Amino acid sequence: MSIDRLLTKVLELYQDVHDDARTEQIYGSTTALLTNLSNPLNLSLLTSQLLIAPAIWGRPDAMRTCYRVISIFNSAAIHVRRNELENAKHKGPRAGGGLGSDAWAAAVLKGADGQSNRWQHLLVFTGVLMGMESGNRNSLSGGMRRTVERAVVTAANLALRKNEPVPQAPAGPVTLALNFTFSLLSESSRASLNCDALIPAATTAMLGADGLEDGYFLGAVDIDVRQAVERFTWEPNSPSYLHITQLEKKPLVSGLGPLSRLLGYAIQNARDSQVILQLQDDLIAFTGKLFQHWQVNNKLSELEISEESIYLTPETISGTWEGLWSFLKKVMYAIVAVSQAVVARSLLDWRLKKHDVAPVVAAKTLHTLRNLYFISSRNGSDSFQVYQFTYLTSLDTLSRFGDASAAFLEEIKPNTEGTIPFHPLHRTLDLFYLNVAEHLPLHLPPEACDKLIIQPAITYLTNAAAPLSPRMMELFESAHSAVLSVLSCPHNAPITVKIVPFYAETLFSSFPKHISPRQFRLAFKTVMQILSPPFPIAASHPQLAETLLEMVRYRASIAGQDPNGQAPLPPPPAADPLEAQEPMSEQSTLVLTLIDALPFLQLDIFEDWMTLAAHAVNEIRDSALREVVKRRFWEVLVSGEMDVERAAIGVAWWGTKGGREAVLFGRAPERQEEMYMMSGALSRPERGSKL
C-alpha cells in the first residue's frame, strides 16, 4: 500500500473506536506514517488528527493511551534520525520520508493545534524530545532543541493552569510526560516550570488512581491467603498478587524514582510554601491508609519477622512474600525521598523556619515516617542516607520546641498502659515511639518526661521475658536508651533520684540474658556520669553513686563464686561491629564496670574505690579474663579519661601507695632478702618514699 493510501486509511480509522487488535494496528500504522511521510503538511495533519481521534482517546485505559502516544512519537523520532544518518552515508534511494530531524520535529509541533488540549500536546512534545535527544543522541540543532524544550514547558504550564470554567487537565498525563522529559530539560527550561501547580498534580498522580491507588492494593491480599498444613500460602497466580505485579508495571509506578526527583525539584523551587504543607498532609493521608490496609485487612500483619519461616510456606517466602516487600520498599524509598526534599527546603525557607511552622513541618514528616515504619524497620531498611537525614533532621527541629515535642509524643503515645501489646504492628509503632522519645527530653518538663517517656519505657523494662525475639530485643534496648536520655538531662534530677535505684536493679536483672557486656557497661557508665559532678544530683544525693558501686562490687563477688558467672560469655553477634572481641564473663564485665566508673567519682571516695577495684580485678580466676581487665585498668589511668585532679591522685596511688602491686599482683610482694635472712644479720630499715 502506498504511503498516501495508508494515510487516508488511517485517518478514516481514527473516526471510530475499535477492538484491541485493530487499535494496535492503528498504532503501528501511525508510527510508520510518522516515519515515512515526506510532506511536512501531511505530518502536521496526521498529528492534529491523532490528537482528536476517537479511535485513540475513546479507549477505557486513559493512562495507557497516553503512554502509547508518547511511545509512537518517540519511536518515530528515533527512526527519522536513524534514516537521516543512513541517507547521509549512502547515496541512492532515501530511507524514510527524507526529512531531516529539525524539519520533522517542526512539522510535528505544528500539528499540535487548537483543536486538541494542551496536555495532549505535551504528550507529543515529550515523544519528540525523547526520541531525538535521549541516550545522548543529540539529533536536533541547538535552536530546535530549545524550541522543543520550550514547547514542553509551555504546554505543561498551560495544562496545569486553573482556567475556570475550563476543567483542569488530568494530573496523570501531565506528570507522566514531565517524568520522562525532566532529565532532558536544560536548567533554564526547568526554571520556567510552574512548580506551585506541579506539586499538587504530581502528588495526585503519584498517590492516586494513576499511581499507587491510595494503598488499596494491600487490602485485597488477605482474601487470597490460604492455610496449607499448619502454614499459610499466598499463590503467585492469585488475583491480589497479579494486581500488584500489574501495578508495578504502571508507567508512574515503575518510574517512582524519577518521579520523586521531579517532585523534589518542584519542592525546592516552589514559591508558595502552602503547597508544601499540603503535600505533607497528602503524604500522611496516603501512608496512613497504607498502614491501615496492612493492619486491618491482612492477617499476615500478625507475624513477626522471626515467625515468618514458621507460619509461611517456603514457596510463599521466596515468591510472593519477597515480591510484596520488595515493592513496598520501593514505595517507601519514593515517599522518603519526597519527604527529604521537604525537610531540606524547611532548613532554608524563612517561611518554613518560623517558630510556629518549623515544628509542624517536622512533626508531619515524623508522622509519615511512623506510618512507613512497618516497612522501614524490616532488616535495616531505614539505614540509607536519605532516610537518616530526613529522620534525624526532623527530630533535631522538633526537639527545640518543648510544647510541640510533648504534643507530638502525646499524639502517638502507645494506648496500652503497663502492658506490652499483643499485635506485632503495635509493637513496631512502640519501637518508633521509643526511638523518637529518646531524642526529645531536653526541652520537656520533668512531668512530661515521666509521663511520656519513662512510663512507656518501663513497660518494656519490667515485662521482658527470656528469651527475647529480635523485635522485643530492639524494644528492650530502646526502652533503656529512652530512660537514660531522660536521666541525662540536668533538669530531671527529681525524676533521676526516684528512677535510678529501679533502673539499676533492672540493669542487673537484665544482664547477661537480655543485654550484652558492652550495653551493660555503657548504661551503667552513663548512670554514673549522671550521678557525678557537675550534675546537681551529685550535690543533693552524694551517696547515691557510691551505693550503686557497692551493688556492682557485691554482684561481682557473687558472680565470682558462681561457675556460670566465671565462665566466658558467648561472643556477640557478628553483625554488631561495636561489640568487643575480647573474652568476657559476667564477673569480669562487672569489674570492668567498676573501672569504667572511676573517672566520674567524687574526689573524697576516688582513691578508696581504685583500691577496691584493684582487689576485684584479682578475684577473677581466669587468667585470660583477668588480663583483659588489667589492661582496661591501665587504659583508664593513662588514656586521658580522668581530669587533672583525678589523674594526679591516680598516679600517686599507682606509684607510691601500692596501686601497681594491687593491680598486677593482688598484694605488695615480699622482698627476697626478707624471705631468706642469715642468722644474726641486721635487718634493713624500710625506706620512705622520696617523692
Model-assigned labels for residue ranges:
Residues 1-56, 623-624, 628-629, 658:
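N-terminal alpha-helical scaffolding segments that mark the starts
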Residues 10, 108, 457-461, 503, ...:
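Buried hydrophobic core positions in alpha-solenoid tandem helical repeats
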Residues 25, 65-68, 334, 428, ...:
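Alpha-solenoid helical repeat scaffolds
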Residues 34, 73-80, 125-133, 181-182, ...:
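Hydrophobic residues within the alpha-helices of tandem HEAT/HEAT-like
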Residues 39-469, 608, 626-627, 643-652, ...:
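Extended alpha-helical scaffold segments
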Residues 260-264, 282-283, 288-312, 336-339, ...:
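Extended alpha-helical scaffolding regions
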Residues 397-434, 467, 475-478, 519-523, ...:
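Eukaryotic alpha-helical solenoid repeat scaffolds
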Residues 426, 456, 461-472, 476, ...:
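Short inter-helical turns and helix N-cap capping residues of alpha-solenoid HEAT/ARM repeat scaffolds
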